[in-house]
Design a protein with these regions (language model features):
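Glycine-rich/acidic phosphate-handling loop/turn and adjacent ATP-lid/helix
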Residues: 155-174
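Flexible, glycine-/charge-rich segments associated with ATP-binding catalytic modules
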Residues: 4, 184-240
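A residue-level detector for a conserved hydrophobic packing site
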Residues: 122-123
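Conserved micro-motifs of the catalytic ATP-binding
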Residues: 72-77, 110, 114-117
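Short beta-strand/loop element within the Bergerat-fold HATPase_c
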Residues: 141-151
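Conserved DHp (HisKA) dimerization/phosphotransfer helix of two-component histidine kinases, i.e.
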Residues: 11, 24-101
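Short helix-loop "hinge" at the ATP-lid/N-box region of the Bergerat-fold HATPase_c
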Residues: 133-134
C-alpha cells in the first residue's frame, strides 16, 4: 500500500474531533475516500479481505464523532436563498445521470415554490431517495415527486399505470433525516425557512412527453456503485 495513503489514515485517526481540527479532518476524509478503490485493491488479500473496509469505517467514525461534537461550528451553519430554476436544473441533471444507461430522457415541469436551503444537499438527497426506484423500474415511465417542508420530506414514485409499487423501494419517512445527514457531512445543518416555505418538484421520466425541458448527461453508473463515498454513507441513515 502506498505509504502516503497510510500516513493520511494514521494522521486522521490521531486527530481529536475538535473544532480546531475540523478543517483538517474533513480534508483528510475526502482525500482518503477519493482513493477508496485503490485502498480496496491493495488490502484485498486472502488473509485480510476486509481490511480496506475496516479502515474506511474507522475514518467515517472519526467524521461522525466530529459532526456530533457540540463544539463544532457546523452546528450553527445556515444556507442563503437560492434561485429555484438553478436548483431544479441541478436536480434534473443529476436524476438524468441515473437514467442515462436506459437511454431515457428526463422532463421537468416547474412549480414556483420558494426554498431556503443548500441546493447540492437537495440534489444529493433526491438522488438517493429515488435511485432504488429508478434502478428497479428501468423500461417503465415513472413519475417521481419530492416535497420538502419545515418538518417533513416525502417522496412519491408511481409508474405509468398510476401504481405505487416502486414506492416500497424507498423509505419516505427517512427522507428528512437523510437530508440532514447530508448537510452534516458537508459542514452544516439544514435549516428550512422559518415561515415553513417548501420546495416541490414534479418530474416525469419518459421519452415521449409532450412538454417539459429535456436534459442530457453522460453515463455515470460508477456513482451508484461507489456505496462507500462519504455522501452515500451519510445518506443511508447511518449517522449516530
Amino acid at each position: 500500500m502506498p505509504y502516503s495513503l497510510l500516513q493520511k489514515i494514521d494522521r486522521l485517526l490521531s486527530l481529536e474531533e475538535t473544532a480546531e481540527n475540523e478543517g483538517e479532518i474533513r480534508e483528510l476524509v475526502n482525500e482518503i475516500f477519493a482513493r477508496s478503490d485503490e485502498l480496496y485493491e491493495l488490502t484485498a488479500t486472502a488473509s485480510e479481505p476486509e481490511r480496506g473496509k475496516k479502515m474506511l469505517s474507522q475514518c467515517l467514525r472519526k467524521l461522525r464523532t466530529l459532526n456530533n461534537n457540540k463544539e463544532s461550528a457546523l452546528k450553527n451553519c445556515d444556507y442563503s436563498f437560492v434561485e429555484l430554476d438553478k436548483l431544479l436544473e441541478g436536480v434534473c441533471l443529476c436524476t438524468n445521470i441515473l437514467l442515462s444507461e436506459s437511454d431515457m430522457n428526463l422532463f421537468f415541469i416547474p412549480e414556483k415554490v420558494a426554498v431556503s436551503c443548500c441546493p447540492s444537499l437537495i440534489v444529493d438527497s433526491f438522488m438517493n431517495l429515488i435511485s432504488n426506484a429508478v434502478k428497479f423500474s428501468k423500461g417503465k415511465n415513472i413519475t417521481a415527486s419530492l416535497t420538502l417542508g419545515k418538518r417533513q420530506c416525502v417522496v412519491s414514485v408511481t409508474d405509468s399505470a398510476g401504481e405505487e409499487d416502486a414506492l416500497s423501494l424507498i423509505r419516505p419517512k427517512s427522507g428528512l433525516r437523510s437530508v440532514q445527514n447530508t448537510a452534516r457531512l458537508h459542514g452544516g445543518r439544514l435549516l428550512f425557512a422559518s415561515n415553513g416555505s417548501s420546495f416541490s418538484a414534479r418530474m416525469a421520466l419518459s421519452a415521449d412527453l409532450p412538454r417539459g425541458k429535456r436534459y442530457h448527461a453522460p453515463p455515470f453508473s460508477s456513482y451508484l456503485e461507489n456505496r462507500f463515498s462519504p455522501v452515500h454513507l451519510g445518506l443511508c441513515d447511518c449517522m449516530d
